Amino acid sequence: MKLLSNEKPTTTKKSIPEIHVVGTVGLEDQPLLAAHPESVMPSVDVDASTHLSVDDLRGPALLHRRTVLAGLAGAGTALLAPQLTGCAGAGVATRSATLPGSIAEAARGLRARSYSCEELTRAYLRAIDELQPRLNAFITVTGQQALDQARRLDAELRAGKDRGPLHGIPIVHKDLYDTQGVRTTVGSEFFKDRIPNADATVVTRMAQAGVVSLGKTHMNEFAAGISGTNAFFGDAHNPWDLARSPGGSSSGTGAAIAAGLCLGGTGSDTGGSIRVPASWNNITGIRPTFGRVSLRGVYPRAYSLDVAGPLGRSVADVAMLLQAMVGHDPPTRIR
């Protein structure tokens, strides 16, 4: 992850509003995969000379992507989780290693009945509940709605209906994608109570692909900037080092994926708002070709430059997310 500055992000002294949680969710302890240890994140043999320690994550090795990739031996950054868990003193925040490390791994577990969509969703909600106070990656958590979605998707799998590789996969949406019945603030106090009456086209397409939406993520106000700061909702923090910025403007999506609070998410990019969080959080993102993904229901920053796109833990994950997002809107006719 390459950082542009060694300076700590500026934090606002203004009081931060409490995170908005839609519905009451019981986050009782339900150890995911307890009965299926073989489905837990696989171990990877890494040569001792290239193995990364927690100290490496805060040192020069973190600044060189090739070093990171060599240390992971192609395994993906999720495999660092066992080293990071419980390292609060080092300023690091990440989820438990018992959660799937990729969309493909989660999809295999769901189809093998190692766990249900509801169990997977509940596990991620537990992780959010634990790490949100430190990361500030979310503006709104849609816990009850997510569990309801997951139960419906479980019923479909039992009935033999499989929507594809994203069926039951927990993801997040940047808070400038309209979501019916769930507030969309665009990161601004001005829109803090705005509730759209329809989903953005991308939100609809991803729901049709079977994703479970865990909530709406932090962003720079009106997608203006790459700092991850927000005067009203407070600053987001980088899970690799809580004293640093996760980048922006898709700051919450980047931080949530890197911390293992979801398996992927949506962002938008006008001048770097997908690419910067992907780089600063050491995850993967893509800025699709202009017009490849619908912008209907996505709050505009600059009509001629805005692009909607996905972020994920790996190229494979991002490819699956992008496949669900792509598609043109019907042409507009001027009468």
How does the language model describe each region?
Residues 72, 76-81, 91-270:
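Gly/Ser-rich catalytic/binding loops embedded in alpha/beta enzyme cores
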Residues 1-63:
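N-terminal secretory signal peptides
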Residues 184, 224-228, 275-280, 298:
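Short acidic, glycine/serine/threonine-rich loops at helix termini
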Residues 59-69, 82:
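Twin-arginine (Tat) signal peptide motif
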Residues 270-296:
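Glycine/threonine-rich beta-strand-loop-alpha-helix active-site module
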Residues 63, 101, 112, 251, ...:
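Residue-level signal for the nucleotide or nucleotide-sugar donor/cofactor binding architecture
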Residues 88-91, 162, 287-335:
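A short helix-breaking turn/cap at a secondary-structure junction
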